[in-house]
Design a protein with these regions (language model features):
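Repeated loop/turn-to-beta-strand initiation elements of outer-membrane beta-barrel proteins
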Residues: 69-75, 111-115, 170-173, 201-208, ...
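Detector for outer-membrane/organellar transmembrane beta-barrel domains
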Residues: 187-301
């Protein structure tokens, strides 16, 4: 079998889960290996007691691949790592560590769907992406998921997940069973998401999404927690404008003395001003009751300038008017900043 390998392999950079990739291997039967990478440097005064700016580095690196079985199916897989990722391994390591964001293998059966297992890219990202448009701030929904599953990064990714995804016309579907692992202390979990894209011709496109997840802790490991998440939202596309709106709730039982409930609303707007410039704005509200009592009320304004098709400069300001949360006398935070302290962000992002 004739094979082609790029003569110069790209040096180690750090990976993104975007569709951007460099193909470094291709076989005659269609099998491929792709390199993903991202490097970034950010200046921000987020969570700085003196209000001074500080520099932060982030980077990702990884490989994804596909091996052709026949014309109907392929073996697929991905391993993606990040410096300073929001993973459990970094919560127990004081130093920035290279930790796994995604590590999975599966079968792509074309029109019959795709099955993946491991630390997968959750189908619930169809929902969370509605609010996840900024380089400088994170979505806040499902923030309590890691109280029942230590490996969970909200509902984006969790160890030991077996997932099925497919597309039927304009309908995208995803369903998963979460087995967990020895670190998870999880009895079971499952989730599902549906997205339907409505083409309205000259009036644009509407893409409503519904999502849910359920997790149960393993009482044999002393984890007597129960977690439920659901959300509804939509994106609307018209020319160079994209608008998004979502609402979600999650309930955590067995961690606090009462049932802890987060209610989250997020609104986003993106305008591609030109091939080089993009403008973004958004509002985020989170209200917790029965738990840490955290409240978020964030307004974000962001400007992106595209240096190349894949690399950009971002600058933003996040106005925060929430209230800090507390658990056992210790402040809880989300997004790396106090809920009542605004901050700026300036960053350069290189992507391959």
């Amino acid at each position: 079998m004739k094979k082609t390998l790029l003569s110069v392999l790209l040096p180690a950079a750090f990976i993104s889960n975007t569709v951007l990739a460099a193909e470094i291997y291709q076989a005659e039967d269609g099998s491929t290996v792709d390199l993903y990478s991202r490097l970034g440097f950010n200046i921000t005064n987020k969570n700085n007691a003196h209000g001074d700016g500080k520099g932060e580095f982030d980077g990702r690196i990884g490989l994804s691949g596909s091996q052709t079985i026949n014309e109907h199916a392929s073996v697929i897989g991905m391993a993606q790592y990040q410096v300073g990722a929001a993973e459990y391994a970094n919560q127990v390591n004081d130093k920035p560590a290279l930790t796994a964001r995604y590590v999975w293998a599966g079968i792509d059966a074309k029109e019959y769907g795709r099955i993946t297992g491991g630390r997968v890219s959750s189908g619930l990202i169809m929902f969370t992406d509605i609010g996840d448009v900024f380089a400088s701030s994170d979505v806040s929904m499902a923030r309590q998921a890691n109280k029942v599953d230590k490996t969970a990064t909200q509902v984006f990714r969790q160890d030991g997940t077996l997932q099925y995804q497919n597309q039927f016309g304009n309908l995208d579907v995803s369903a998963a069973y979460i087995l967990g692992n020895n670190t998870s202390e999880l009895d079971y979990g499952y989730n599902a998401a549906l997205r339907y894209t409505i083409d309205m011709g000259d009036f644009g496109r509407l893409a409503p999404v519904v999502a849910m997840q359920k997790n149960k802790g393993d009482t044999r490991e002393g984890n007597d927690t129960d977690y439920t998440f659901w959300g509804v939202g939509t994106r609307y596309y018209l020319g160079d404008v994209m608008l998004g709106a979502l609402y979600s709730e999650d309930e955590l039982q067995g961690f606090y003395t009462q049932t802890s409930t987060d209610k989250v609303t997020e609104l986003t707007a993106v305008y591609n001003l030109s091939d080089k410039w993009a403008l973004r704005a958004g509002y985020r509200s989170l209200q917790n009751s029965g738990g840490d009592e955290l409240e978020l009320s964030d307004t974000t304004l962001e400007v992106q300038y595209k240096l190349t098709a894949r690399s950009s400069i971002y600058t933003s300001y996040v106005d925060r008017n929430g209230e800090r949360g507390y658990n056992s006398g210790q402040e809880t935070s989300f997004g790396g900043a106090h809920a009542d302290e605004s901050y700026y962000h300036f960053g350069l992002r290189y992507e391959l």
